[in-house]
Design a protein with these regions (language model features):
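Short, helix-capping/interhelical loops that line the mouth of catalytic, cofactor-
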Residues: 2-15, 62-115
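C-terminal interaction segments
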Residues: 2-6, 70, 88, 212-262
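An N-terminal domain-cap segment
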Residues: 2-51
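Hydrophobic packing residues in well-ordered alpha-helices of helical domains and bundles
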Residues: 17-20, 50, 107-110, 114, ...
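Short, contiguous alpha-helical
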Residues: 40-80, 129-178
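Internal, conserved structured core segments that host functional sites
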Residues: 94-146
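A glycine-rich beta-turn/hairpin centered on an aromatic-Pro dipeptide
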Residues: 170-198
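Glycine/small-residue-rich hydrophobic helix-like segments
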Residues: 188-225
Length: 262
């Protein structure tokens, strides 16, 4: 019998809504200080410039009011843990759209997006369905995915500019937990315990299940290293060599399971 599909943990809606706005504000403040030369500079995301990345970040938040303004679909098609794997199929469309975003005035763009987001979510129910390009999901779940987009791309922006943009604690927590739960769903089991303090602990990989005492197979890392591994920004071997990941036990090698999303 195949293993039961993992049920997503619950997220505090009020905190998630606030976290999206808080992280976007952090990015907005940093973007306002970027010079034209910095905006035209490269990123680690292929051919994207910093300006492309800035536009993409705005779009990730702007998608909330835009989807809420569209008619609601008839039925839910996506659970929260389905989302990470579905993004890969939309990569080409996302790239094309990002390159077409008008970001000549980043400050004006971000001011408009922040205002539209706050107005749109103010009276919207978590159960409201949104029609994404690859399926329908609830607003509550979609907002959790926005924390992933914002935190991961904040890290990209920091890497490209050295801006030192801070991470909202709640946004970083939600991002970490969703990607950790995605790993547990992708490789169900109890042989390996993955610890990402202070936000998440999950068990994964088939094999003997740990019940008490110290687990025989343990992986531990920090949240930013985890999101870089989970999204392919870095590689398992490199982070092990840099001592950003500790892995003990014969099954504690996650290299074959990563990345979880691109």
């Amino acid at each position: 019998m195949p293993p039961a599909k993992k049920r997503a943990r619950s997220y505090d809606s009020v905190k998630t809504r606030a976290a999206v706005l808080a992280q976007f504000r952090h990015v907005r403040e940093a973007v306002a200080a970027l010079t034209p030369e910095q905006l035209d500079g490269p990123t680690r995301l292929g051919e994207w410039t910093v300006r492309d990345l800035v536009g993409h970040l705005a779009w990730m938040v702007d998608s909330v009011p835009r989807l809420l303004a569209a008619p609601a679909p008839a039925a839910r098609e996506l659970a929260l843990l389905d989302w990470p794997s579905r993004t890969a199929a939309a990569a080409e469309r996302i790239d094309e759209h990002t390159r077409g975003i008008e970001a000549a005035d980043p400050a004006g763009l971000y001011a408009r997006v922040a205002e539209d987001y706050e107005k749109a979510v103010a009276g919207a129910a978590d159960e409201r369905l949104l029609q994404l390009s690859f399926g329908a999901m609830t607003l509550g779940d979609f907002l959790v995915t926005r924390t992933v987009e914002l935190v991961v791309h904040t890290d990209d922006l920091n890497a490209a500019t050295g801006a030192g943009i801070p991470y909202d604690r709640q946004a970083l927590a939600a991002c970490t937990r969703l990607l950790a739960d995605t790993l547990a769903m992708t490789a169900p089991g109890g042989a390996v315990e993955v610890r990402i303090p202070p936000y998440a602990v999950v068990q994964c990989v088939e094999g003997p299940r740990h019940t008490r005492g110290t687990p025989p197979n343990v992986v531990e890392t920090d949240p930013l290293t985890w999101l870089r591994l989970a999204t392919g920004r870095t590689e398992w071997a490199a982070e092990l060599d840099a001592a950003h990941v500790s892995a003990s036990g014969e099954r504690a090698d996650l290299s074959g399971l990563l990345p979880l999303m691109g």
